[in-house]
Amino acid sequence: VGVWENYKLYLDRGESLSQWHRRVPSYFTFDDHELVNDIWGSAETGKRHRRTVFRDIGTQAWFDYLGWANPTEHHHPIHFGKATMRRDSDLLYDQNADFSKMPLSEMGNLHVHWGTPEAGVNDMQYDNDSGNKNSYVYDIIEVIDPHTLRLHMPAKVDDTSVSYSIGRRSYGKTRVGNCEFYFIDTRGDRQMHDVTQRDKPGVSMLGKPQREWLLRSMKESDADFRFVISTVPFMIPHSGAGGFEADAANKDEAWTGFFDEREALIAEWEKIGKRVFVMTGDLHNSFAIKVTDNVWEFCCGPHNSVNHVPVNDESDRPATGKFKFGPRECDIRWSSYILPDLPRLERLYPYFCFVQVNNVLKMPKKFGGKRLVAYPNPQVVFQYYNGRTGELAYAESISTER
């Protein structure tokens, strides 16, 4: 209940936030804080961690309050249920479910929930092994009958009241003019990264179904510009927590923990030959990065959080200039940047990004009239503004290939 109460509390108390939601049509995508902080490995078969199996609870609350308006490729909701599991048996039985009618090939994997009151609390003291003994990430092997599933491994203990869920696929796309927008899910089908082997083949943030959908859709589109909405940074590591507690031994929220998949995406985007803009967040800084001539990253950090310190939290990347972390060098054209001598509560420099697509120029035959003429090469202008003063801090204009 606490997750839903959080949304209600912020909307009740945040009058300006409520007005925004009431008056401005918006699309949203979720990251870890919409579920639970640092939620990793939701698709890592056999993983046991209280944050990991909180995925569907947090995702359902997000859909109830924000995600209901989003375009989605698959519409079947999360399935929640109570089931029976028997020790050493790989069967899960739910008398109230009809698994034969569920489009399981279009849904996620199965999680048995942690079951403690603190399961969704952002506090590392609860990252222990006190949860339900059968709480793991499970692959569904087959439907035995309408009420029974075979899972990839047997239960650890007998339990006649297992709280479980089968996830949904939360990605989708929409088209506005000559721009295609792809809203990807970076948490729901995410395998477990390993910062000691960032280029491990096959480790995926998206999962095979989503990755194949994304690349197929992007190749089939005739849009001039493709916007990929990713909740986590593409080129800059998120390797610190800004002074908060974190799993320092394996901390990285970004695509820099998934080099194999990231580089495969870039290679396929280069084949398309059109502009691809990866719109990212999560890090508490903003930046504009040229990855290739066609692929760019534009990150906008949160508006109400202290900034990260790049020296500590972003693998000591520069404010501008060439930066290489892993197999690919990129060009940081601009960024917000905080020096480490600032006290934590002085690190409050938000920026917001306004994206303007210029397809036509105004050219009336008579002054005051109306006529629009198409540009031979449309352009997209990314404008970063200081969140405190409203002043323009940086702009980057990118046109179609000439």
Residue map of PLM features:
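Long, structured stretches of catalytic cores involved in phosphate-ester chemistry, encompassing
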Residues: V1-R402
